[in-house]
């Protein structure tokens, strides 16, 4: 499967569309003979500096590694905030706000108590990041080749949504067991303090169901979140380079490009938090309680209940998403991976729409 995907990816429209236009000679007739030759020479040099080919197995593997770092490290870094957010969701009478939640946690558990659940967070979200970013690149290449160059451009937002949803479906299966353990450790005082204590206890009480009963609500939370995360990020980057950044992306330094990545990531993160928060509340309560179903929890929480802890989640997810995209893009820069620019309208489509002479 992966070999066929790699073969398709080499020809897909996201594989450096700017360079492809020059190579095909589509922009040649309007330029003197010398500049096009120089452009082709520079384009070739740019391709040669990459450590691997776009769509190759090495490319996808390194993208997955970037996902491991971006998701695993960032989620672990905000464990204290995540812990307070989860406790606000499952016990709103006791934890009435962010600062109140931190105060109570410090008083009852001490500073070390704020780090509860760091191990399942690191393991679970590293596995999720591997699948999320790695499979996103795979599905985006696969779907774009099915659509063709013109439809890929016209339906690019739908492409981002479909690719990210497909990737997140598999990513959540990898995340679910560790997410269940994390919530138990963070929200049930005295249940377990470490991952090694929680896993055997959960298995003894409920079997495998303890680890996967939350996968459906996890899909409810994470798939809309990831669809918004990737689609909003891709379109925001495109808009920033088009309307905000005063020069073309090709003329920006790597550092300037990474700043654009961070800003676009934060904007995407705010929308992600809002879209996914109700399901996040259900997941937190469901993993705390034994024998409950998602529909029962949703009915009990009500409309106001599912929005508890939203402000904390906006701060956490906005920062998380910005850092994740920054780290992911930095990994691509460090390993010299192909980083195609935002898509441009194909010349064939411009001619059909009468935008060229």
UniProtKB/Swiss-Prot annotation:
Solcar repeat residue intervals: 58-142, 155-239, 256-334
Gene3D superfamilies: Mitochondrial carrier domain
Cell compartments where the protein resides: Mitochondrion inner membrane
Family stated for the protein in its record: Belongs to the mitochondrial carrier (TC 2.A.29) family.
Modification Phosphotyrosine occurs at: 191
Transit peptide: 1-45
Mitochondrial matrix side: 82-116, 179-213, 280-309
Pfam families linked: Mito_carr
Protein name: Solute carrier family 25 member 3
Keyword Phosphoprotein appears in the UniProt entry: yes
N6-methyllysine: residues carrying this PTM: 107
GO MF term list: phosphate transmembrane transporter activity; phosphate:proton symporter activity; protein-containing complex binding
A single GO BP: mitochondrial phosphate ion transmembrane transport
């Amino acid at each position: 499967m992966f070999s066929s995907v790699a073969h398709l990816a080499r020809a897909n429209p996201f594989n450096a569309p700017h360079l492809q236009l020059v190579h095909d000679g589509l922009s040649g007739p309007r330029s003197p003979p010398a500049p096009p030759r120089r452009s082709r020479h520079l384009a070739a040099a740019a391709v040669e500096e990459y450590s691997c080919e776009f769509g190759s197995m090495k490319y996808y593997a390194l993208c997955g590694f970037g996902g491991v770092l971006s998701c695993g490290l960032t989620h672990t870094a905000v464990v204290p905030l995540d812990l307070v957010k989860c406790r606000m969701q499952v016990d709103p009478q006791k934890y009435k706000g962010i600062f109140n939640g931190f105060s109570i946690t410090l008083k009852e558990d001490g500073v070390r108590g704020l780090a509860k659940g760091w191990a399942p967070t690191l393991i679970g979200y590293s596995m999720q990041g591997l699948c999320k970013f790695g499979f996103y690149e795979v599905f985006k290449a696969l779907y774009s080749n099915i659509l063709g160059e013109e439809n890929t451009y016209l339906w690019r937002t739908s492409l981002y949504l479909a690719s990210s949803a497909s990737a997140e479906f598999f990513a959540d299966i990898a995340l679910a067991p560790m997410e269940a353990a994390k919530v138990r450790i963070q929200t049930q005082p005295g249940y377990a303090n470490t991952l090694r204590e929680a896993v055997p206890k959960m298995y003894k009480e409920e079997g495998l169901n303890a680890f996967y009963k939350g996968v459906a609500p996890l899909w409810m939370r994470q798939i809309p979140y990831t669809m918004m995360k990737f689609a909003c990020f891709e379109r925001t980057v495109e808009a920033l380079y088009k309307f905000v950044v005063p020069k073309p992306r090709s003329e920006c330094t790597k550092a300037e490009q990474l700043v654009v990545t961070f800003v676009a990531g934060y904007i995407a993160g705010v929308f992600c938090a809002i879209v996914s928060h109700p399901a996040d509340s259900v997941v937190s309560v469901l993993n705390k309680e034994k024998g409950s179903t998602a529909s029962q929890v949703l009915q009990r929480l009500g409309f106001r209940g599912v929005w508890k802890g939203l402000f904390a989640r906006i701060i956490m997810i906005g920062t998380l998403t910005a850092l994740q995209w920054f780290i992911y893009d930095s990994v691509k820069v460090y390993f010299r991976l192909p980083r195609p620019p935002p898509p441009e309208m194909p010349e064939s489509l411009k001619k059909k729409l009468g935008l060229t002479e």
